[in-house]
Amino acid sequence: MNRTFPYKPYMTAIRLDAVSKVFEGEHLAVDELTLDIADGEFMVLLGPSGCGKTTLLRMIAGLERVTAGDVWFGRTNGTRLAPRERGVAMVFQTGALYPNRTVQENIMFPLQVAGQNDVQAGSTAAGLAQILSIESVLDRMPRTLSGGQRQRVAIGRALVRRPQVFLLDEPLSNLDATMRTELRQEIGAMTRDLNVTTLYVTHDQVEALTLADRIAVMRDGRIEDVGTPTQVYNDPATAFVAGFLGTPRINLLAATVRVTAHHRVALDLGNQSISLDPTDRRSLILRHHDGADVIVGARSNAFSLTDDAPNQLTGTIRAFEFHGQQSIAFVHCGIEVVDPDRVGRAAPAHASPAADRTPSFLSRLRSRAGLGAPPPPAPEPHGATHRRADVVVELPVDTELARGTRVHLALDTSRIHIFDQTGHRVDRITR
């Protein structure tokens, strides 16, 4: 890229300190969330729709009022600062360009508002347009641009002010697959070249894994896991994180710990079982939990076809798909499969949802206001978390197996994760 734009950002670290947001109607969107983003870091907020990631971004920008907690920019508490005082620029999902202004005028506009003369603002806009590969469309109106070009213009208009923090709210979600890939690569390269602190919101795991220095995975207004892309994929903190990252989704299998007379640990999966090596660190942990119900996480590539492996599962192929570089088999093994979207959410069967649990921010807020507890939610239907389903297995591309074929699957136990019934790792590795 031609770096004619004299970009010298005033970088800053961001700290979110126990930040919460409660909307009218007592909807708790963000629940006492704490997160640190370093100077110049590219942090991705990843999670399903409605998890609070966009609300969090808007609180950082000053577009949503923080109900509790603090937002820090370096050593400055920015919680009560107006948006224009925060040194933050934000790109929205739709771009939100001025329709009656040309591309160059859109990019120049923040500089003109700041009092810069038209000649200098135009020169700066032209330099940034070269970085964004839109110099050929500077005189065109937004309605004549492609979706990718409009998003480039929106990015240029945000960056031209040299913000301390750059916020992007699902900027690629309205683009086709080819354009998403192209612009994703450009955003990653550009933000690192410009060395600006960046927060990027998405529900797309591919965007998160390819762009981020670190990923914060969110669910229900809280952070489930934070780490590098490699860490959150290979060493997930919860079953939800393991299930949210990866295609095909990880197999989450309901199991019961069984300790033999010789202190060997087996994991019973219905009428089948697998054993852990006695030297495996997880054996030492599970040895004291005989009879405990756990969840075994195994990605599709942890399985292989076998005839004589010591740890194997037997099943029948229900479906077989060719994916170009690999084949995917759906094998019925008669094992209960856990839904990662529900695990950790169901109320304990022995208590009401509010019992034996640390009060949340919302309940404490109600208490201080002198309000009673809201009525408990309806109980989860029986079997909502566990269900009978197929084990998904990745096989070599040249494998040809017919539906109904009986197969034996070796499971590499060194590649499995073990979670408790709340979805948290039993064998958690401290980062």
Regions flagged by a language model, labelled:
Residues 26-28:
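Short coil-to-beta microelement around the adenine-binding A-loop and adjacent beta1/P-loop entry
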Residues 15, 36, 72, 408-410:
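ABC ATPase nucleotide-binding domain
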Residues 260-431:
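Non-catalytic connector elements of ABC transporters
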Residues 68-77:
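Conserved ABC transporter NBD signature motif
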Residues 46-48:
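The feature captures the beta-strand-to-loop junction immediately N-terminal to the Walker
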